[in-house]
């Protein structure tokens, strides 16, 4: 659990899919969110600070379908893989868990795999920036490589964003985005 918590600390805004053999497991709040959205069993593994640790998991061989559902629900997912095998672990002395690290982060706007994308629809990643009284808007479909940039007035932003229907919208933290 210590290794999981270290990895999770580096990716607090992502659901962490943590590889354990033939499964990806999720723990704590990530497990509660994933179990609810995916309709899978929420169980427990051990305890932390005297409380049960919520846990759920999905088979590695069928992970794409689960990832697609979480991405469509708007979640960011960090994939943590075993980066050494048991033989390598033995060569380094066999102490501690297998080495693991995040090898990929999936967000709704950066998915490129056909099996994770909605069929026959654009998957736009949209970014906003301000230049005096104008707004710069850039959009890219990562699966096709299409990329466009346009400058618009404030009053055109809502219409433009609605037309693009982005999978993900990125904007500066100090940007005052309207409540549409």
Place the predicted regions along the sequence by residue.
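Basic, polar low-complexity surface loops/patches
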Residues: 1-180
């Amino acid at each position: 659990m210590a290794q999981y918590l270290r990895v999770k600390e580096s990716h607090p805004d992502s659901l962490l899919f943590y590889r354990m053999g033939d499964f990806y497991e999720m723990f704590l709040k990530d497990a509660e969110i994933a179990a609810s959205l995916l309709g899978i069993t929420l169980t427990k593994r051990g305890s932390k600070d005297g409380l049960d640790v919520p846990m759920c998991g999905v088979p590695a061989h069928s992970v794409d379908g689960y990832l697609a559902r979480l991405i469509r629900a708007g979640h960011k997912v960090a994939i943590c893989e075993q980066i050494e095998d048991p033989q390598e672990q033995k060569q380094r002395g066999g102490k501690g868990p297998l080495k693991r690290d995040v090898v990929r982060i999936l967000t709704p706007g950066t998915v490129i795999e056909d099996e994770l994308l909605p069929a026959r629809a654009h998957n736009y990643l949209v970014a906003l920036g301000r230049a005096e009284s104008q707004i710069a808007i850039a959009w890219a479909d990562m699966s096709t490589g299409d990329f466009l940039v346009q400058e618009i007035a404030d009053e055109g932003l809502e219409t433009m964003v609605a037309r693009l229907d982005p999978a993900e919208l990125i904007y500066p933290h100090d940007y005052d985005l309207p409540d549409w």
